[in-house]
Swiss-Prot record:
Keyword vocabulary terms for this entry: Ribonucleoprotein, Ribosomal protein
NCBIfam families documented for this protein: rpsB_bact (TIGR01011)
Underlying gene: rpsB
Region (Disordered): 233-293
One Gene Ontology CC term in the entry: cytosolic small ribosomal subunit
HAMAP family: Ribosomal_uS2_B
Single GO biological process annotation from the record: translation
Basic and acidic residues bias: start-end ranges: 233-256
InterPro entries for the chain: Ribosomal_uS2, Ribosomal_uS2_bac/mit/plastid, Ribosomal_uS2_CS, Ribosomal_uS2_flav_dom_sf
Cross-referenced PROSITE patterns: RIBOSOMAL_S2_1, RIBOSOMAL_S2_2
Organism classification: Bacteria, Pseudomonadati, Bdellovibrionota, Bdellovibrionia, Bdellovibrionales
Protein name from the UniProt record: Small ribosomal subunit protein uS2
Species name: Bdellovibrio bacteriovorus (strain ATCC 15356 / DSM 50701 / NCIMB 9529 / HD100)
Gene3D superfamilies for this protein: Glucose-6-phosphate isomerase like protein, domain 1, Helix hairpin bin
Length: 313
């Protein structure tokens, strides 16, 4: 299980909070003392909260959920991108665009535009543009890449969010809360720990501290993802076994139906025809039966996609 230790946190400077005059009183339960005008965070409480948050992230991944990392301050950009790449999840490190999740359809159109320009570049279509048109597209491409690179493959809402610097990312947190998306965050002494589901008391300014918790979340997600892969394999194996059993049962029943009520090797007496053979089939139907007009009632089964064919007709 992914966890952090007291030594790792001390080495990363997790215990250093903000100046005492810049604190949020709601962080009082997590403050150990104050020294030199700076609050010192109680790491015994931090380790408990951090490991609890890691368990939650693992559970999200174990159920097939996705995660988004959010950290747009200078110190957070590199650690966030590395952690997101490590576990293959989404990230935002430029600026959180208002409505990035609550108005995702609009953001999705920008993502589609980014993909379209990508395709144009791959096909060499830029070579047929004028210098001015090419420069305009390049500028648009760079702007879209800056803002959307970390979510370009996002097709639906993530199951959880990890945030660095709660006061700075308050818009992202508010959108997640509105959509019912749980939030895990590093909560420095100037933060409101009650604004998120899993607050990890700690320094959100030091790069080493940010990297420590970002990697903790990434490692926890990877552990859960392995469990999810195992569940998928088990489900696939069960479906395969069921299909094999059904196929085997079909082979056993077929000879019984053919030989029922007749001796081995005996010839069947020719049946008298009561009328011309009837075969019903349409463009959207399988050929399901053939017989005589008086003896056979045909029930056609629609192919998969029945509704599409009928509406087209």
């Amino acid at each position: 299980m992914a966890q952090v230790t007291m030594k790792e946190m001390l080495d990363a400077g997790v215990h250093f909070g903000h100046q005492t005059q810049r604190w949020n009183p709601k962080m009082k339960p997590y403050v150990y003392t104050a020294r030199g005008g700076i609050h010192i965070i109680d790491l015994q409480k931090t380790v408990v909260r951090a490991n609890k948050a890691a368990e939650f992230v693992k559970e999200i991944a174990a159920n097939g959920g996705r995660l988004i990392f959010v950290g747009t301050k200078k110190q957070a950009i590199e650690p966030i991108q590395e952690a997101a790449a490590k576990c293959g999840q989404y990230y935002v490190t430029k600026r959180w665009l208002g409505g990035m999740m609550t108005n995702f359809e609009t953001i999705k159109s920008s993502i589609d535009r980014l993909r379209k320009i990508d395709t144009m570049k791959e096909k060499g279509e830029f070579n047929y543009l004028t210098k001015k048109e090419r420069a305009k597209l390049e500028k648009e491409y760079l702007r879209l890449t800056d803002f959307l690179a970390g979510i370009r493959d996002m097709k639906e809402m993530p199951s959880a969010m990890f945030v660095v610097d709660l006061p700075k990312e308050h818009i992202a947190v508010a959108e997640a809360k509105r959509l019912g998306i749980p939030v895990v965050a590093i909560a420095d002494t100037n933060s409101d720990p009650e604004s998120v589901d899993f607050a990890i008391p700690g320094n959100d300014d030091a790069i080493r501290s940010i990297k420590l918790f970002s990697n903790l979340v990434a490692d926890a997600y990877l552990e859960g993802a392995k469990e999810w892969e195992g569940k998928l394999r088990t489900m696939t194996d069960k479906q395969s076994d069921v299909a094999k059993e059904a196929k085997a049962d079909g082979k056993e029943e077929a000879p019984k139906r053919r030989g029922a009520g007749a001796k081995a090797g005996a010839k069947e007496a020719p049946k008298k025809s009561a009328g011309p053979a009837v075969v019903k089939a349409t463009k959207s139907r399988k050929l399901v039966a053939a017989g005589t007009a008086e003896e056979v009632e045909i029930q056609a089964e629609l192919e998969q996609g029945q509704s599409t064919d009928e509406s087209a007709e």
